[in-house]
Amino acid sequence: MVSQVVNMKGMIPSIVADINVDLAKASFTKAGIAEDQIVIVEDEKAAEAAIQEGKYVACKSFMVACKTPSIQAVVDATGSIPIGAEIALNSILNKKHIVMLNAETDCVVGPILKKLADDAGVIFTGSAGDEPGAVMGLYDFATSMGFDVRVVGKGKNNKLDYDCNPDTVAEEAARRGAAPHMITSFKEGTKTMVEMALMCNATGFVPDVRGGHGIEANVKEVPQKYSLKEEGGVLNNYGVVDFVNGIAPGVFVVVTHKLKEVRDEMEYLSMGPGPNYILYRPYHLCSLETPLSAAMAVIEGKGTIVPKGGLVADVITVAKKDLKAGEYMDGYGAYTCYGLIEKYETAKEMNAVPIGLVDRKTKVLKDIKKGEVITYDMVEIDKSTKL
């Protein structure tokens, strides 16, 4: 992302924080910034002085970015749920706009952080370039044109494998140059579930079924397959979120229009016979697009994708294997559990544990069978974090 920002007009990546300060520094040098232009600091006073001299700042603590006066927007790209919550909270408390390139934190406490940001007069937002942000762009485009949006969703580039773990994906992870836990979170589906939950929380849509249908389709097949069952499709209801095997890395919305004149025009424009049509974006550029969200927050005072209110959907925890009382769990992308999207009210009625609250300090209190939804009475949740 730093390499992208240095070539964008009107924006400067002033501070990079990483617990390994050498990595923070390397993000600048990889972007073509000379080493004599990079200063390593330990506090916000030194950071501000360096910025005023036109230097770039590397540091270990995110608090430096949150507290340095010249900084207007902070991006959380940690992927850590509790750390992400702390970064967002401290950014807000210090009157900085906060961009979450961390869907997992947003999924768990996004509505709370959004309320705190509103009260502080700053913007809390998800990131452009992530699938939820890309979907929101299509959703806003469609609704502003008067279309009725029926389905929103994303492509998935590998089939679900609930049994995978960092050991079974190690070879693939090495080949792709990615961390095994990250590849596991993709293949087990938790990452997709989290991203769909953000779409729900921003639009008010819900999953049609727990975990989604996850149909196989090409782009042209999506509108018909995402019709109601009585119309020959798979859906029980419209106003839903889902994912498709076969159209990754794209995102989509399925729309219709109440007027025949518009539907006829859509068919003339080669959008299909209707009544459902797909608006499809064949790419999402991840962190390369994130700076656009920072610019929108600072310049326009708007978010890319934000929760409408409270949680609409949640990602509940499911046992990946038989678990014994006394064991400790580990969270998504690992060995003991994965997540499935569910309507928030249903998850609440079930007393289901959100996947974002499960970590290595989560203790199993009673035996749990593989495939069983984990509820609060089954485990002891770690209460040491701000979550």
Describe each model-derived feature in a short phrase.
Residues 59, 99-100, 125, 150, ...:
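Structural detector of well-ordered beta-strand residues that form the stable sheet scaffold
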Residues 18-21, 63, 79-80, 102-106, ...:
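Short, ordered loop/turn segments at secondary-structure junctions
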Residues 1-88:
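N-terminal glycine-/serine-/threonine-rich beta1-alpha1-beta2 phosphate-ribose binding loop
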Residues 78-94, 101-122, 127-129:
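Rossmann-fold NAD(P)-binding glycine/threonine-rich loop
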Residues 6-10, 29, 33, 115-123, ...:
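Generic secondary-structure signature for well-ordered alpha-helical cores
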